[in-house]
Structures are given as C-alpha cells and as structure tokens.
C-alpha cells in the first residue's frame, strides 16, 4: 500500500543512513511505532514533512504487523490535529484503525515523548521505534530516552533543512514550562 501511495504521488520513502539497525539484545517482538507530528498548514492539511513521516511510519508498520502505531501531535489548525491527520492518511492507505493509537495533546517533541511512552507501555510494547525526520532525529531520541522510553530504533528520512530546527528547539525548551490544557 505504501509503495502504491508513493508511486501515485511521486514520493519516495528513504530510510536515513543514520537509522539504528537492530542490535542484539533488543526485543523487536512487539515494538510500538511512534510517528512524530509536524505543524499543519493553516487550512489544517499536512505539510510535506508530516506526509513523509506518515508514509515512512506506514512502511515500518507493514514490516511489524504486530506493532501498534502511535501518531502523536496536537497543535490544531482549522479543527484538525497533527495526529488526526496522520490517522486519516494511514487508514486511507489501508492500515487497520485498530492498530492506531491517537495522541493529540502534544505540542512539542518533549511532549510527544512524555505522552507516547506511557501509551506504548500500556499497549504492551517491548520498546519504541521512533519515526521522524533526519534533522530532528537526535533531539527526538534524547527526548524519548528522557521520558523513560526504550528506544529500539529511529527511522528517519533526509529532510535537509536544519534551519527549521531553531524554532522547534525553542518550543521544546519551553514546553515543559507550559501548562497542558
């Protein structure tokens, strides 16, 4: 399904050279696949980075059919959250809704981790496979480790725009100080 979606849209899914390969001693029997959100357009539609992350997550979900898929991201625009848009795309591309766990309160990478780690544990996951963008990978890995997550691997695609990280970094530094409503 992901290959068909890519063929129809002209997009390709690439796994970053920095993706962590399976390591002896890590338990991949039931990982939770956590797809990190990215800000929506003002009209509530997905930006290309979020679309790529979601397709990458779908490819990983197909490789691990026993794994729950956690889509995480709030930041509503025009009545839609990042998580809701990812869920809609995954279902449209054939992922069973029963595999998807929606986390739609997070407004930063720190909160993605804080809210997703307990959901993964509740789902009985043996660890987490984080799906994000290459310029976001290091920070995401650290945030999930800080939140007590057992990060088995991180899968990312090259997004090639480190300047985007400045605003994200500032938001992530401030997010633990921001009340969640």
What positions do the PLM features span?
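Secretory targeting and sorting signals
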Residues: 1-14
């Amino acid at each position: 399904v992901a290959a068909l979606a890519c063929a129809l849209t002209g997009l390709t899914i690439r796994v970053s050279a920095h993706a962590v390969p399976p390591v002896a001693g890590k338990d991949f029997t039931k990982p939770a696949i956590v797809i990190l959100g990215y800000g929506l357009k003002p009209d509530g539609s997905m930006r290309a980075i979020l679309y790529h992350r979601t397709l990458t997550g779908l490819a990983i979900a197909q490789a691990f059919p026993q794994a729950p898929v956690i889509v995480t991201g709030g930041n509503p625009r025009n009545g839609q959250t990042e998580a809701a848009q990812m869920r809609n795309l995954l279902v449209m591309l054939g992922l069973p809704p029963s595999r998807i766990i929606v986390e739609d309160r997070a407004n930063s990478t720190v909160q993605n981790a804080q809210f997703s780690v307990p959901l993964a544990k509740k789902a009985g996951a043996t660890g987490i496979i984080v799906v994000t963008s290459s310029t976001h990978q290091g920070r995401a890995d650290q945030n999930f480790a800080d939140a007590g997550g057992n990060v088995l691997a991180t899968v990312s695609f090259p997004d090639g725009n480190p300047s985007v990280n400045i605003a994200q970094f500032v938001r992530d530094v401030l997010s633990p100080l921001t009340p969640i409503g």
